[in-house]
């Protein structure tokens, strides 16, 4: 279909959508109808006729005028859309939707008469910033906490501990208790689903199980049995258990504890690649300092971008929101796959729908941040020189293995994105006012811990356990 013969008008719609109205002339509607008959006559199989040789009148009689009109209309709408976006140099980012529906258009469609079609599609928005300079933002500072070094060393000692049996004393906090237990709800005596076990290793640490459970076990001796009263928290994951009181019949079948290695140079060699405890401490200190600096930089950037987003005016098209939600879903699936989970069986249609819905706010936020930075680059003329990109690519390639397979175009785009991001953040730092929020405790729990390099030969292994409804 020639675009020159079409009358096309466009109208912006809310949500970054564009309505495209196309008037198809009478001769083209007639041609589309005739083409549909010819196409169907070539494909239809009727007894007594060779394929492709079915007369026109027989085709119409057998298939009916409505089916032929529908076939003609489908082809005509597709062609009109392609010609219209080419003629008007439009760049839709989603498939078009027919305004008023196909059935309504089919009822009014008469071959040989002009027809007006309106289709809608999402288009890329044009983000604007009300202001770029003089933005004010506050960020949470992150300070290095030297005490975390001792905590990390202690965690590493626990990883390398040797599990030994306890003899001659009662259970204490920090022990490993081998328990048999059965739980019932106190209000009606019903058995707690998932609240029982024949033999389960339980770390006697506060917070491991629901309130009252660990406290009830501490002080028991091997062979003892007792009933422990507990209560499920109000925010417990299973709704029917929230806030309910429960009684657990508990038997302490065995008791073990961990013998921790001494903090010395031998421990440092076992826990890391370092030769001495002093070197290990220095490594952990530097790791925590680097982590604190990284997180503070991230906090500063988040605050600046947040202030910039407040100045953003943009309508997010649904197509982009859905695509970003799918990206987040794919990232989640990839993380599960790396953990050895069967993603295909885990990601049921219902779960996918829920994840897509739940990820929508994050998807919208990510899009707003991206559009805000794009608008800033446009408004302030911030760009990256080709020489800088080439130099950075050379640096990156030096760090890659000689036989690494890379896509040159994707690498170049990634480098450009990183460099423009750095320039944009530097510009925001220079042209905004950043203040520190009130100091907060440095939550460095996510900093990497020194993984055990070697496992002690005497360390006992216990089978993996499934979580019960007594666990917090």
UniProtKB/Swiss-Prot annotation:
GO terms for cellular component: cytoplasm. It is an enzyme of class 5 (isomerase). GO terms for molecular function: peptidyl-prolyl cis-trans isomerase activity; protein folding chaperone; ribosome binding. Residues 452-464 have a biased composition (Basic residues). It catalyses: [protein]-peptidylproline (omega=180) = [protein]-peptidylproline (omega=0). Gene3D superfamilies: 3.10.50.40, Trigger factor ribosome-binding domain (3.30.70.1050), Trigger factor, C-terminal domain (1.10.3120.10). It is found in: Cytoplasm. Coiled coil: none annotated. Pfam families: FKBP_C (PF00254), Trigger_C (PF05698), Trigger_N (PF05697). PANTHER family: TRIGGER FACTOR CHAPERONE AND PEPTIDYL-PROLYL CIS/TRANS ISOMERASE, TRIGGER FACTOR-LIKE PROTEIN TIG, CHLOROPLASTIC. HAMAP family: Trigger_factor_Tig. Involved in protein export. Acts as a chaperone by maintaining the newly synthesized protein in an open conformation. Functions as a peptidyl-prolyl cis-trans isomerase. Consists of 3 domains; the N-terminus binds the ribosome, the middle domain has PPIase activity, while the C-terminus has intrinsic chaperone activity on its own. This is Trigger factor. It comes from Parasynechococcus marenigrum (strain WH8102). The lineage of its organism: Bacteria, Bacillati, Cyanobacteriota, Cyanophyceae, Synechococcales. The gene is tig.
